Every structure is written in C-alpha cells, then in structure tokens.
Amino acid sequence: MANETPAMPSPAAPESKPAVPAAAPSGTAAAPVPKPAAAVPAAPPPEPKPNPLPHVDLPFQGVDYTLRGVHAEATVAPADVVGAAEKLDREGFALDTITGVDWIAAGQMEVVYDFFHFQKTLRVAVRTRIPRENPELPSIHQVYPGANWHERETHDFFGIKFLGHPDLSPFLLPEDATYHPLRKDFTS
C-alpha cells in the first residue's frame, strides 16, 4: 500500500538505574569506599579586642564590631547608669538608642544604651539588668535630653519605669494601653 505511512518507532524507555550498586562478581575486588575527610580542628577563639576607651572609668570590653555593631560594651549596675551617661557625655559621645530586652527565663529585663562619637568613629553600648517583676532604674534624660522619648518608647513596649522621668505617658501605644507588647509573655 503506497499511501501508508511507516509506523513511528516507539520512544525508548529510560534506563532505570539500581538504587544500590550491584555487588561485585565473586572473585573480583569491590571498588574502594572513599573515606570521609578528616575533621578540621576548630579555630582558636578570637583574641579579645582592646578597650578603645581605657581612660574612661567604665568596665568596657572591646568586641568585634562586625558581630556586635559596637566597638566596646560595658555592663553596669542600675544605680550607675546616670554616672555612665555623664562620663560618656564628657567624652563627647551622643546617645543613639535605648532599648529593652526581656530575659524571661532569667526573670530579668535588660536595658541597652547605645552611644556614638563622630570624631572618634566609635560606637559603645552600656547594659544593665533589673528584676523583671519590678523593672525600674534611673532616667538619663537629665544628661541626654533626647533620652526622653527613647525611655518613653522602652516603657511602652517593655514596661520598664525610668525613675525621675518627667512624663512616662504612652508614646506609641494608645493612651489607655495597660499592656507592653515586647514582653515575651504578652498575648494579644
């Protein structure tokens, strides 16, 4: 028949590969199994960074700026935050931010003050911890007037009371808010 088209060959089925390599025929050696690479010894801890402010009477420790966002950190007692702010003010530092951290498992709140110095290109943090049940510490608004709204915001979100602050009325939350949304036990 002249008008018939030849049948198309059916496509070849893809070869299936066994999931597990076949065992070597008896009498032949199996291919060697590669050994895992030797464990690389852990790098030694980084050298501590020098204190960039050795002349300032605060317990600063130099830290890695790329990891922490500051060049040095100091932890002080709550009663010493105003004194720390005064020392940094005398050195020409400006206040950048104030924030809180809720360490619920430890029953503590932390307040972190970030300062910067334009001429020295330095950023430092001062930290303090207070009991979570009654979180109070002195206000630094007398030293840094711009701390006024930072402290109000931290009070709004964490419930931390800054003693001596002229007005801790809600800053960002509704006026009738009785909650602090950044505390870890907050539920909406």
Which functions belong to the PLM regions below?
Residues 1-188:
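Terminal low-complexity/charged segments
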